[in-house]
Amino acid sequence: MSLLVKICGLSTRETLETALDAGADMVGFVFFPPSPRHLSLELGRDLGRQVNRRALKVALTVDADDATLDNIMDALSPDIFQLHGKETVARLRDIKQRFGRPVMKAVPVATSADLAVLPGYAAVADRILFDARAPKDATRPGGLGAPFDWHLLENLDLNLPYMVSGGLHADNVAEALRITRAGGVDVSSGVESAPGVKDPEMIKAFIRAARATQDASQELSVR
């Protein structure tokens, strides 16, 4: 199975084009005002058109209501909704039924106890995204540049695709994949020169590093 690489929090035509040209499988757009990566609906519409089916469009939301999701659906027509708040299993089910789109549920991780929610979410979600749990005083749940203990996923038994995020960058993505055996990686702050400012060279370096890990793994498997 091919590794999925997601570049999240894209907000300019230049950096989106860089991610697409470099081979990102998923491009993420943030619709959450407290985030420095938040997009207006108008910009989301423009960037969505630019993607033009070259990657999967992911709309990141945090405890959004139906009206907000309706507007995002109209502007971006995302391929996937990434739910990064405290959405319940019932809420995931409602969103899937209302919009007919897959949902990826972010699960914040700090200790093994945080994994107790997985059976409930796994019954409804199409994919799980493991992210570092934000500090209690944080104004947003992700994109903070902090990793979690990847060894918590070392013996994970989850019959569902999952990705990892949180503090990833070109220099540690190989280690994250080796430990977690995740089917995908998601990066935001790890390809930025400042909060919300994506760096084209860092985007390309991250995707190269992730792909190199995949290539090395495939080479070992055929020996």
Curated annotation (Swiss-Prot):
GO terms for molecular function: phosphoribosylanthranilate isomerase activity. It is an enzyme of class 5 (isomerase). Keywords: Amino-acid biosynthesis, Aromatic amino acid biosynthesis, Isomerase, Tryptophan biosynthesis. SUPFAM superfamilies: Ribulose-phoshate binding barrel. Its EC number is 5.3.1.24. PANTHER family: N-(5'-PHOSPHORIBOSYL)ANTHRANILATE ISOMERASE. Belongs to the TrpF family. This is N-(5'-phosphoribosyl)anthranilate isomerase. The gene is trpF.
